[in-house]
Amino acid sequence: MKKIIFLIFLVSFLQSCKSTYVIPAFSSVKTPSAPDYHKEENWAVLPNTYSKELKQFSSTQIDTLQADVFYVYPTLNTEKEDLRWNVPLDDKKQQDKVINKAVLFQASAFTTSGKLYVPYYRQAHIRSYSMLDVGGKEALLLAYADVKKAFETYLEKYNNGRPILIVSHSQGSTHTKFLLRDFFDNKPLQQKLIAAYIVGTVIQPTLYKTIKPMEKPNDIGGFVGWNTYKKGAYPQKKHFFKGSVTTNPITWDDQKSTRLKQHKGFLYTDKKLYKNALKIEVTDGLIWSTNPKFPMRFLMSFIENYHSGDINLFWQDIRENALLRTKTWIKKTN
């Protein structure tokens, strides 16, 4: 017990020892080179480049899958000492995070529903959100320009008229909100949209003209989204979340609470699935979760914001739901 108390004290002490970094002004001249998405090296994942670890969670017959999954990963550049506004695509550290964290514990949930496409992009540093007026907006727009270009190349080179699942988290969802607007909303391509999982961002139900929140487990052609916090906790700017789409990621309907036995599975970093691990409550703009039952539960008791677990906390629930929606789309359109 003394050792645990010491570790908690040490972490708190180290966090309090903050260094001051001078953030350079955003400059379009100094941004990393724009990617060419016709080159495979600029894609983290294509159907023919699955890593050994990803294959463990994927369909054994990828070629038979009738849908595609276009996934945009969350903010991974969070180090304060990194003064770059945007990350170059060939940054090995970021590439490792994309493949072995984001893809492995988020995108993997969708690999039985469709072929996975994950573009690298010049991701904006996390500070961009708190410094929108002094470079953050430009950094995020640059990142979206890459995502947009990647999607255009995907449509041109890979899609071949197949139905699409759009999947994203955090900064990725900042970009896919625009992607839905620019390519799907009130446009012919909406007919190919199975579903959009726009997770870890605030999204209002009236954001689009013709794309609506999905309210049943087998709804198609719309979107779902949620933000997860510890039960009873609120974000600092909780008013931003009020009225936003808050999908129940366990029942996928209008149920406001769930029981342990309804939870299908939380994928932890040990790559094990923990079933019946949590209960949730849907409140205005937030999903409140109990402390999940898994080996590191004690440490989770000190965390209120479950943002990083928005997807893998409900990994198996999402996996089964994505497959249901995909099968529903195929059945209705054939």
Please provide the spans of the model-predicted regions.
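Positively charged n-region of N-terminal signal peptides that target proteins for export
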Residues: M1-I4
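C-terminal motif of bacterial Sec signal peptides marking the signal peptidase cleavage site
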Residues: F13-S16
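Surface cap/lid and interfacial helix-loop subdomains adjacent to catalytic sites
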Residues: K18-S19, K148-N160, D182-T328, K332-T333
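N-terminal extension/subdomain marker
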Residues: K18-V98
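Active-site catalytic motif of lipid deacylating hydrolases and related acyltransferases
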Residues: V22-S28, Y73-R162, P295-N312, Q316, ...
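Structural recognition of the beta-strand scaffold that forms the well-ordered cores
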Residues: D68-V72, Y117-Y120, L165-I166, A195-I198, ...
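Gly/Ala-rich beta-loop-alpha elbow adjacent to hydrolase catalytic centers
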Residues: S168-G172, T176
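Short, hydrophobic alpha-helix immediately C-terminal to the catalytic nucleophile
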Residues: K177-R181
